[in-house]
């Protein structure tokens, strides 16, 4: 059994598994430009994941990572996006991610109900996971996590009584009121 290690940034512990390592690699590549495998290895080590260059090379290959030119002209690693977009793209800025969440909320959100720190969102059939992905990628600090089914999402607020404020915020986004 592998032990979880506590990362330096004080976040949740990360298990030493292939799946956890792949998730961290994707998170890092989506969060910031990474120019080399050695830079990526250092960022993973900062999160408590020690990897060899051979393992990292294999992981990048399994994830479909390629080097692309970002808007600044630098060659950086990128992975294919979730949601069917197989062409790797440079990470979106925070405002682009929030705009995507706003647009998808306006298109897909049918209702939002809150109870304590929970929010239940309803969408058309088949759309819940798409909206959940946009909410996750927006990395809103108030949201601890999302769970999505076919037409229902559950959001968990960090604030024990923050569900109603979160539901109201998402409903305002859906109505294009900022």
UniProtKB/Swiss-Prot annotation:
HAMAP family on file: Arg_repressor (MF_00173)
Subcellular location as annotated: Cytoplasm
GO CC terms in record: cytoplasm
GO biological process: L-arginine biosynthetic process; protein complex oligomerization; regulation of arginine biosynthetic process
Protein name: Arginine repressor
InterPro entries tied to this protein: Arg_repress, Arg_repress_C, Arg_repress_C_sf, Arg_repress_DNA-bd, WH-like_DNA-bd_sf, WH_DNA-bd_sf
Keyword Repressor among UniProt keywords: yes
NCBIfam families on file: argR_whole, PRK03341.1
Keywords associated with the record: Amino-acid biosynthesis, Arginine biosynthesis, Cytoplasm, DNA-binding, Repressor, Transcription, Transcription regulation
Pathway: Amino-acid biosynthesis; L-arginine biosynthesis [regulation]
Organism: Streptomyces griseus subsp. griseus (strain JCM 4626 / CBS 651.72 / NBRC 13350 / KCC S-0626 / ISP 5235)
């Amino acid at each position: 059994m592998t032990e979880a290690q506590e990362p330096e940034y004080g976040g949740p512990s990360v298990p030493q598994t292939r799946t956890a390592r792949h998730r961290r690699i994707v998170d890092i590549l989506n969060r910031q430009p990474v120019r080399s495998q050695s830079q990526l290895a250092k960022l993973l080590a900062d999160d408590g994941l020690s990897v060899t260059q051979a393992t990292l090379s294999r992981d990048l290959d399994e994830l479909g990572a390629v080097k692309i030119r970002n808007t600044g002209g630098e060659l950086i690693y990128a992975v294919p996006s979730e949601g069917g977009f197989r062409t790797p793209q440079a990470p979106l800025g925070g405002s682009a991610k929030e705009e995507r969440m706003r647009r998808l909320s306006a298109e897909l959100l049918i209702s939002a109900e809150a109870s304590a720190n929970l929010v239940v969102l309803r969408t058309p059939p088949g759309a819940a996971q798409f909206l959940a992905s946009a909410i996750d990628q927006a990395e809103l600090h108030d949201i601890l996590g999302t769970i999505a089914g076919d037409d229902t999402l559950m959001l968990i607020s960090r604030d024990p009584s923050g569900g109603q404020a979160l539901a109201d915020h998402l409903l305002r986004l859906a109505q294009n009121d900022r």
